[in-house]
């Protein structure tokens, strides 16, 4: 038995013991290093497990307070903030972005609506102009550059994963409407009141809790991606290569990149924090007497808004609601390139295989974080096995083309 598997700690309701078994197997058979999983059912914790090593260089163990970079789960954090403001009537989904951000109207963008941005249909999936080193650490410069961009496709006609840009597009709307940065709004009006450990822009006071991201595995579809990356004219090339160093492994564990408010890929959280953050949206928009949105806000968060068997950026099946990932494709997409969650669920995967989501039909909110990255752009077998076990425990079955249904 892997030593880390024998050190799993925390609590697990008897109904979800299969989740605990899979969590243990992740250490025994799937090369987990350090990780945590949390599940809330109807707002109450039913799984809260952790184990392994948080800092390989020192041997520091993963404990109940460990937090780690969760990268693109920041997109879901930002989308939650957007829906809070939409529900308050401060942002109109059908309004042009330029109504709030006049500088955005240049180069054929005057008619792009908030909903078009949130559904990855704006045609602005990357910065086409070259970003300088550490370019996404400078909010104002990144926003000015984004406002000058011209859509790659006609907005609203198709979709492609806005992997690096969507958080900045939404984050600037949040700043213009509230006067607060997205990280401040998240802490002051969402995660803070929920007492959820989730940040976009990590305070220095939280640094001692951070787990070190380690051991990036080879992409299971590396031959495919190597071919795509060798094509500079492919639009997705800049998703990887024009990020100002954001995707550079040398920057993953730096204080500067954890501190930066990057609402596309800059999330930091614990599994417990993610389960708590999504908990209101697994119910009616409220938990423990704290209401974030009215029940009428939930359909826009849940219902698919854009879907394709071949996302223009990822060249894989993807589906999005307004701001959130839904189930992505079938398991035949290959390890690391699918996200199989409930038909009614919404959330986001994070680089390396973490995930946070809510499912109002199943009444669960879910957070899984780890520090050993897997390949692909979705869930690898570690995270997916935990999701699968949770849904089976609730009596769900897996469907074709790839989601869990009752």
Task: Label every model-predicted segment.
Residues 17, 23-24, 43, 67-95, ...:
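Active-site SXXK
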Residues 262, 283-287, 296-297, 302-310, ...:
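Short, gly/Ser/Thr-rich active-site loops of penicillin-recognizing serine hydrolases
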């Amino acid at each position: 038995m892997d030593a880390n598997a024998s050190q799993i700690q925390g609590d697990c309701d008897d109904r979800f013991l299969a989740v605990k078994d899979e969590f243990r197997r992740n250490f025994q058979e799937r090369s987990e290093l350090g990780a945590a999983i949390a599940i809330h059912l109807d707002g109450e914790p039913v799984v809260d497990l952790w184990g392994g090593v948080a800092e390989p260089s020192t041997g520091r163990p993963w404990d109940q307070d460990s937090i780690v970079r969760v990268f693109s789960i920041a997109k879901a954090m930002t989308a939650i903030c957007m829906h809070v403001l939409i529900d308050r009537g401060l942002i109109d989904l059908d309004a042009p972005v330029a109504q709030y951000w006049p500088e955005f109207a240049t180069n054929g963008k005057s008619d792009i609506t908030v909903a078009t941005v949130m559904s990855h249909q704006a045609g602005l999936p990357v910065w086409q102009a070259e970003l300088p080193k550490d370019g996404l650490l400078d909010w104002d410069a990144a926003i000015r550059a984004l406002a000058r961009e011209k859509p790659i496709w006609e907005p609203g006609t198709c979709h492609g994963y806005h992997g690096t840009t969507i958080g900045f597009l939404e984050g600037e709307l949040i700043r213009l409407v509230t006067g607060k940065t997205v990280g401040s709004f998240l802490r002051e009006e969402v995660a803070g009141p929920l007492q959820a450990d989730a940040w976009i822009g990590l305070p220095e006071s939280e640094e001692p809790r951070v787990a070190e991201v380690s051991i990036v595995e080879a992409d299971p579809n590396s031959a495919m991606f190597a071919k795509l990356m060798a094509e500079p004219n492919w639009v997705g090339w800049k998703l990887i290569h024009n990020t100002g160093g954001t995707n550079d492994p040398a920057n993953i564990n730096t204080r500067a990149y954890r501190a930066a408010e990057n609402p596309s890929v800059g999330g930091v959280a614990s599994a417990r924090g993610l389960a708590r953050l999504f908990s209101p949206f697994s119910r009616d928009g409220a938990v423990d007497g704290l209401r974030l949105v009215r029940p009428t806000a939930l359909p826009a968060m849940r219902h698919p808004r854009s879907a394709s068997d071949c996302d223009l950026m990822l060249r894989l099946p993807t589906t999005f609601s307004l701001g959130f990932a839904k189930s992505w494709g079938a398991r035949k997409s290959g390890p690391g390139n699918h996200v199989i969650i409930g038909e009614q669920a919404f959330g986001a995967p994070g680089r390396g295989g973490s995930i946070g989501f809510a499912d109002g039909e199943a009444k669960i909110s879910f957070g899984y974080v780890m520090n050993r990255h897997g390949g692909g752009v979705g869930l690898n077998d570690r995270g997916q096995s935990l999701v699968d076990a949770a849904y089976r425990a609730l009596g769900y079955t897996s469907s074709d083309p790839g989601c869990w249904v009752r």
